[in-house]
Design a protein with these regions (language model features):
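Mixed-charge, Lys/Arg-enriched low-complexity segments
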Residues: 1-7, 58-94
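Negatively charged, low-complexity tracts enriched in Asp/Glu with abundant Ser/Thr
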Residues: 1-37, 63
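Extended aliphatic helical segments
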Residues: 9, 22-24, 42, 54, ...
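Intrinsic-disorder/low-complexity coil detector
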Residues: 15-17, 40, 46, 66, ...
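Functionally constrained cores in energy, signaling, and assembly domains
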Residues: 26, 47, 88
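Short, conserved beta-strand/beta-arch hydrophobic-aromatic motifs that form part
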Residues: 35-58
Length: 94
């Protein structure tokens, strides 16, 4: 793991998550967040190549999808974590 990967994992793990928190797994060029309480997938973050920007995905019918109807959601990591924590649809199975 390089330094930026370690920083992403540390920042995700340190976030004050609701519903018992998340576990972070690095996989296929991104980060998958799982509910620590249920083990269910919560979200997937994929670096967007600009500073700490990430593309955001949610679990929908056993696949990863972009939230909303307007294409990719790309946010700075801190804003993406806030969005995941505050939007209930990420936590349906968590």
């Amino acid at each position: 793991m390089n330094d930026s990967t370690d920083a992403f994992v540390s920042r995700i793990a340190a976030y004050p998550w609701p519903r018992g928190g998340v576990a972070v797994e690095r996989a296929r060029g991104g980060y998958t967040l799982y509910s620590q309480r249920t083990g269910a997938p919560v979200a997937r973050l994929k670096p967007a190549g600009r500073n700490d920007q990430v593309q955001l995905f949610w679990r929908c019918r056993d696949t990863w999808a972009t939230p909303g109807d307007f294409g990719p959601v790309i946010l700075p990591l801190d804003e993406a974590l806030d969005f995941i924590a505050s939007e209930g649809f990420f936590w349906i199975d968590a």
